């Protein structure tokens, strides 16, 4: 059985880890980095770039460079947060036929899980290159406050990427695993404050030693799935754009290229201000008008940045209060505070967390890597490689159904340990009603319409009876991934219907299968493209070498030889401009055959000179550095060995 890898699929960056021995190891990608930007770009020559390569070209290709797509996953197009996002990003967010938020690139509509699958494929390949074996199973992390649709969509992304997702695990819980696995001595209650690129979570977790086993029990979780580093960046971008408008009278908002440069500069300035008190944003030739080019030069102090993002930091503290209350603990009961997510490197965030909890956060947890490491540990637990860990997570939001009068009736309260199930008996609202619609909801509001609709289904063929008489038992079952299965049963007839909740949004199995096939087709295309490039390079090398041989041969080549070789060279050059690999290979073979006699003649002549003339071997390199000489010297070197 292969390794189960752990993947932190982040809004801004992603990370992959695997358990080696008893330690989780973060795997470096092909570029040598331990994290990979969650950015995907589609170029004009139909190439798909993922990670650093996509980030590098974002300034010149903003409309086709997708970032922070995780904020759209499992969301409806009409959601307020999606409408806000449309104004923030240079790429096109569009409405899918089922009402979901999708993206459109070069006229093609794509679902967020499809985009995220590209990042997951890169993580999968990174792990495979390191392990030297195929990887098919993974544990993928999600924000603790993700709802059912978002969890299901993340699982779909894994499937499209060719991964069997063994478990969806909450990011703060994963970080707690990474932190607490090797800690000995007594029970502890920790707070994991996770402020990432696009989402915020707070989890209160109890770590206990029970019969020699590490037990991680989540007491409560809360958060905001639209609060993260991207919002901090946006606050600074808006400030810089406003400053530029005040100085030059030009609004950069309508210029995607300028805004992309501004985004990169803002992110860089934000990072610099975590260690410096002041930085300068300097963007020459940001735009131009009739008076000439314009340059953006703005000094930003740490104090200024803090004033711009103060409300965002404050926003993160409300869920902390709720989580503590739900867990039934006070700040004084918290043993350790763990910071996760790149945005927690900001001194203002650290200061606010310290003041809120009354203690300094731990510094021995890497905020960028802890989540992936925890996912790898959970993978090892599932594969049986780690046996002394028990993880008890919770469902972040209340689950229930809509009942008469548009009220939400809860069946499973938030912060219930999962897996779990609950059932309740309901009845009909009208006389002789023969069917009931079970409308499944997730959220904390009493009014059904104010909660997230996870989907609905009908239980039919109920025998006619006065209202209130039929006994309809509705059962909710949440699996260890936090994904809901719902059943309804008429107790009189025993008729039952069970479904795994698939929201009216979300991808159907057929759509996912099609996306898996598309991904596989793209993999074949990529392989063919790579082979074509290699063949072209081979052709280019042969053309160059043959021309040098002709040049060196001079009068030693007959006119017929020169004509035949030149014709074959021209034909190969022409073939290499096209995309027919077989044709290029045929022309390579033809040129090799027609030029071989001349190459052999030259080689024999040089060998004769080398043997006949005293000291000729020392002078030989001066004859030129063509391919024939190179081959001659290689043979000579081999002889010397």
UniProtKB/Swiss-Prot annotation:
The modification Phosphothreonine is found at residue 199. SUPFAM superfamilies: Actin-like ATPase domain, Heat shock protein 70kD (HSP70), C-terminal subdomain, Heat shock protein 70kD (HSP70), peptide-binding domain. Pfam families: HSP70 (PF00012). It comes from Alcanivorax borkumensis (strain ATCC 700651 / DSM 11573 / NCIMB 13689 / SK2). The keyword Nucleotide-binding applies. Belongs to the heat shock protein 70 family. Residues 602-641 are annotated as: Disordered. Acts as a chaperone. Disulfide bonds: none annotated. CDD domains: ASKHA_NBD_HSP70_DnaK-like (cd10234). GO terms for molecular function: ATP binding; ATP-dependent protein folding chaperone; unfolded protein binding. NCBIfam families: PRK00290.1 (NF001413), PRK05183.1 (NF003520), prok_dnaK (TIGR02350). Residues 604-625 have a biased composition (Low complexity). Keywords: ATP-binding, Chaperone, Nucleotide-binding, Phosphoprotein, Stress response. Induction: By stress conditions e.g. heat shock. This is Chaperone protein DnaK. Residues 626-641 have a biased composition (Acidic residues).
């Amino acid at each position: 059985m292969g390794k189960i890898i752990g993947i932190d699929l982040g809004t801004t960056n992603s990370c992959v880890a695997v358990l080696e021995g008893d330690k989780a190891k973060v795997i470096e990608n092909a570029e040598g980095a331990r994290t990979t930007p969650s950015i995907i770009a589609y170029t004009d020559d139909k190439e798909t770039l993922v990670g650093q390569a996509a980030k590098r070209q974002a300034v010149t290709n903003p409309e086709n460079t997708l970032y922070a797509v995780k904020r759209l996953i499992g969301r409806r197009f009409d959601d307020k947060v999606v409408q806000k996002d449309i104004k923030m990003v240079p790429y096109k967010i569009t409405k899918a036929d089922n009402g979901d938020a999708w993206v459109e690139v070069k006229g093609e509509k794509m679902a967020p899980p499809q985009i995220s699958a590209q990042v997951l494929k890169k993580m999968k390949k990174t792990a495979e290159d390191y392990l030297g074996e195929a990887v098919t199973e993974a544990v993928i992390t999600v924000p603790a406050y993700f709802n059912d649709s978002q969890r299901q969509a993340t699982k779909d992304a894994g499937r499209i990427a060719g991964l069997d997702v063994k478990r969806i695990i909450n990011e703060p819980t994963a970080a707690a695993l990474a932190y607490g696995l090797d800690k000995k001595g007594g029970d502890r209650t920790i707070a994991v404050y996770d402020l990432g690129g696009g989402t915020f979570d707070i989890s209160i977790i109890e770590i206990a030693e029970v019969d020699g086993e590490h037990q991680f029990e989540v007491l409560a979780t809360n958060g905001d799935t639209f609060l993260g580093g991207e919002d901090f960046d946006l606050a600074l971008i808006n400030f810089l754009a406003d400053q530029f408008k005040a100085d030059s009278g030009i609004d950069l908002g309508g210029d995607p290229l300028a805004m992309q440069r501004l985004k990169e500069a803002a992110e860089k300035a934000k990072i610099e201000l975590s260690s410096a008190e002041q930085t300068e944003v300097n963007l020459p030739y940001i735009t131009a008008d009739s008076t000439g080019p314009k340059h953006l030069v703005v000094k930003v102090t740490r104090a200024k940045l803090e004033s711009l993002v103060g409300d965002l930091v404050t926003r993160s503290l409300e869920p902390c209060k709720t989580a503590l209350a739900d867990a039934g603990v006070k700040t004084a009961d918290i043993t350790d505070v763990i910071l996760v997510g790149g945005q927690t490197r900001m001194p203002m965030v650290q200061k606010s967390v310290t003041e809120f909890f009354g203690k300094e956060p731990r510094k021995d947890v890497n905020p960028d890597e802890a989540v992936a490491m925890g996912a790898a540990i959970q993978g090892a637990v599932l594969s049986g490689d780690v046996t002394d860990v028990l993880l008890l997570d919770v469902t972040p939001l209340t689950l229930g159904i809509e009942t008469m009068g548009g009220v939400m009736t809860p069946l499973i309260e938030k912060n219930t340990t999962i897996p779990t199930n609950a059932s309740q008996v309901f009845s009909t609202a009208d006389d002789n009603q023969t069917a009931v619609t079970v409308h499944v909801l997730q959220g904390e509001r009493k009014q059904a319409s104010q909660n997230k609709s996870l989907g609905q289904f009908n239980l039919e063929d109920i025998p006619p009876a006065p209202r209130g008489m039929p006994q309809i038992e509705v059962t909710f079952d949440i699996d260890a991934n936090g994904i809901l299965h719902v059943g309804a049963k008429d107790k009189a007839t025993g008729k039952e219907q069970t479904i795994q909740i698939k929201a009216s949004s979300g991808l159907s199995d057929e759509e996912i299968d099609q996306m898996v096939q598309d991904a596989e087709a793209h993999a074949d295309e990529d392989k063919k493209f790579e082979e074509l490039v290699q063949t072209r390079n081979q052709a280019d090398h042969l053309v160059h070498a043959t021309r040098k041989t002709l040049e060196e041969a001079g009068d030693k080549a007959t006119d017929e030889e020169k004509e035949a070789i030149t014709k074959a060279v021209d034909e190969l050059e022409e073939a290499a401009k096209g995309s027919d690999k077989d044709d290029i290979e045929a022309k390579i073979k033809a040129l090799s055959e027609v030029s071989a006699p001349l190459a052999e003649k030259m080689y024999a002549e040089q060998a004769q000179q080398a043997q006949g003339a005293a000291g000729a071997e020392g002078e030989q390199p001066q004859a030129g550095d063509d391919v024939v000489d190179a081959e001659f010297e290689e043979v000579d070197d081999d002889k010397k060995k």
